[in-house]
Amino acid sequence: MQCALYDAGRCRSCQWITQSVNEQLSAKTADLHRLLAGLPVEQWRTPIGGPEQHFRNKAKMVVSGSVEKPLFGMLHRDGTPVDLCGCPLYPASFAPVFSALKPFIARAGLTPYNVARKRGELKYLLLTESQFDGGMMLRFVLRSETKLTQLRAALPWLRAQLPQLRVITANIQPVHMAIMEGETEIYLTDQHALAERFNDVPLWIRPQSFFQTNPTVASRLYATARDWVGQLPVRHMWDLFCGVGGFGLHCATPQMQLTGIEIAPEAIACARQSAAELGLTRLHFQALDSTQFATAQGETPDLVLVNPPRRGIGKPLCDYLAQIAPRFIIYSSCNAQTMAQDIRHLPNYRIQRVQLFDMFPHTAHYEVLTLLCRL
């Protein structure tokens, strides 16, 4: 993939960009083999790739510059701003949004936050696009609520320019630290969630719910999990760290009892909305800590699916799963190193199959799906 920002030395986020996609996949596969060395794997599935560019459904832009000439992108360690509007990872549909937002910031008087001076209001712009219908969600991350009245007053102009903006919010992040968002979310539109659809499964994206940034590969990941579960005798399933319910909603059948657990209430609201649309009455989603939920249960499901953050599921949950011994565990991971550590804490399981998903092209990162069967 060609990138003018990389060629000019202005951005190095895509550290593997000079390698071909095949070379990248080979290196990632070798890394996964190395991490699982000593753990017998019955079946290595062919890695799944996706588009080289224009695949991201989300932009996270630091806002710098002035209110008259804002700049969207990132800041180097020395404070030098870099305009990332031309990043080739973004779809072409993002360009007109960035173009309209620059004069809008002046209209609304949203002075970009100056890190060195600790002054200004607008810290970040967070933009998400639905692959289903092209609808978008835009979040203004502000230092305070000072400019909310001006922001609301200027919004009709922006919505006239960009009718694809379905969900608009102001997120309040008052701390002088490189934290992307705060706890307070103020909705500026009647619609609170962005509609998405993977493999004919309705999904919803809310401002403070995690959602995969590579929808092409994510849809194949969910479809693969559904295929694997469909081949197993599963009537009762837990979906831990479930997010908006992508895995559970794909895997569930009308006959299956499924409980999805996620600590973020916004994500659980999305999952419940999808389950209601699908008419799946035996799906139950709860906003709880996954480890605390699992270890408090007195029953053993047929299958436990885990999709933890990069830190993995950890030894306490591994020990509990080893104790209750569900027949199957499906582990989806964005950090194969912690996944391998966790699997080594499950000695009464064998790895039946492993498949790599290239969710993050041009970087060393990847997603991996692993099926574990009880010995």
From Swiss-Prot:
PROSITE patterns: SAM_MT_RNA_M5U, TRMA_1, TRMA_2. It is an enzyme of class 2 (transferase). Its EC number is 2.1.1.189. It catalyses: uridine(747) in 23S rRNA + S-adenosyl-L-methionine = 5-methyluridine(747) in 23S rRNA + S-adenosyl-L-homocysteine + H(+). [4Fe-4S] cluster binds at residues 3, 11, 14, 87. The active site is at 334 (nucleophile). GO terms for molecular function: 4 iron, 4 sulfur cluster binding; iron ion binding; rRNA (uridine-C5-)-methyltransferase activity. One of its GO terms (biological process) is rRNA base methylation. It comes from the Bacteria. It holds the Pfam family tRNA_U5-meth_tr. Catalyzes the formation of 5-methyl-uridine at position 747 (m5U747) in 23S rRNA. NCBIfam families: meth_trns_rumB. This is 23S rRNA (uracil(747)-C(5))-methyltransferase RlmC.
